[in-house]
């Protein structure tokens, strides 16, 4: 499916926020998906994910969660700066940003306003989990990839699990040095206890960031399998 892309500006309480939008060129009505960035910004990888979703028949939008920062793009080689920047991200502000992206999708004539999902990676994986709770009335499917720190924060995304209404598919790597397996077990237990419909896949050979082919941690077999599962999951719950 041919895709067109553009950058739009959305209003937040802290001023304008850029958001990258990719959508099918063909007319018609499509489900919408919010794409939440890694701790490196809305870079080429995140734009590529947004475009891949559009090619599958979605209107996808990636809000720039770093729009309050002087530097909104951080190279993969500068992990210390990425960590420092993500630590300044406040959950309520990030949820406002995601809310603006959801509102934009719902305002578009080619978007099915009752079929909106969310996907995110790394920092965005954690925020995807939080979005499923915070924006529960809008989100119909959520896919967090290697979301670190889900039990962290006050309140933590994990503590809001009971608010989640949509099905989830969570992806982790067993060799992820940033997300210990006991944390993954904690998430599994809480989702089960709160009766959230979910699937979880842990790839034994994958580490953190395994989906990103611009990073040294890219693990092709795991990434391809996760993407096929992601496509099927969104098609099942949004189309």
Q: What residue ranges belong to the model's regions?
A:
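N-terminal cap/leader regions of alpha/beta-hydrolase-fold enzymes
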Residues: 1-239
